[in-house]
Amino acid sequence: LKENGINQENAVLLAGGAAGDFSTMSFEERIRVASIVIDEAGSIPVAMGAQTTSTQELIRLSKEANRLGASFIQVSCPFYFNHTEDDFFDHILEASRASEVGMIIYNTFWTSAEVSFGMVERLTKIPQVIGLKWATTRSVAMEFEDVVHSFAGQFCFIDNDLLFPISHMLGARAFEVHLCNHWPEWGIKLLKTLEAGDYKQVELDMVEEAKPFYKLWKKIEMEYTRGDGFLDKLCMELVGLPSSRCRPPTRDIRERYRQEAKKMLIASETPRVEG
């Protein structure tokens, strides 16, 4: 990543998020992964994944992230049970009391309660909450746009919904890009094109270069296995980077989809694809 242009001016690294197998790691493994990433990142800010079903564990993760020198922790609503917004708010509040590390609140509405407009208003009262990783259900009420437009002056919004031209126009300044794991230059180009206001080109680049990745991801989920990061890791292997399979229960896709993924990368003009 660093060798191909990623730096403190254009990126924040996420250590131990969903694509990083956080849900299958022990507490000790999560801390070790974050420690290694922080050491290797140098001046690049690091967010440590702190998603958990346990508030007590979140408190420990917050303290460890602060000790390690992480810039942020990523916090989502506890899953499995259908927790209320008040449950989630108290969960966040406990983390804020545990340490001074910054917090990115991740709206994982597909596994837990969705963060409402009212909840975002309440989050403005917690100083450590500096970012929202944002995706929403979609309706005529334009929930995604409503929150970004209303709160872009108070939070750094990370677009996790692939609505990059729209979100940037409304004030979002960060963008969740899986392609950067194997093609960091693509994310750098995205930022430059957005900042230039060339939204037509951004959308064309997304359709021509990013969509094939996400389309294959969706296909794999529909016909073979589910999870996160499985295609990221295969693509990393295909451009010569050390990687692995996802931990079970997500099944290993590498041999089954290797050739299809390779063709996708070549068709998208991804650099460094090997033999």
Q: Where do the model's predicted regions map?
A:
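C-terminal alpha-helical cap/extension of soluble enzyme domains
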Residues: 3-10, 179, 183-275
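Structural recognition of alpha->loop->beta junctions
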Residues: 6, 66-73, 98-101, 120-131, ...
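Alpha-helical scaffold segments in soluble metabolic enzymes
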Residues: 36, 94, 122, 189, ...
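Conserved active-site and cofactor/substrate-binding residues in soluble primary-metabolism enzymes
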Residues: 28, 32, 86, 90, ...
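Active-site beta->alpha loop and helix N-cap motifs at the rims of alpha/beta catalytic domains
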Residues: 1-114, 251
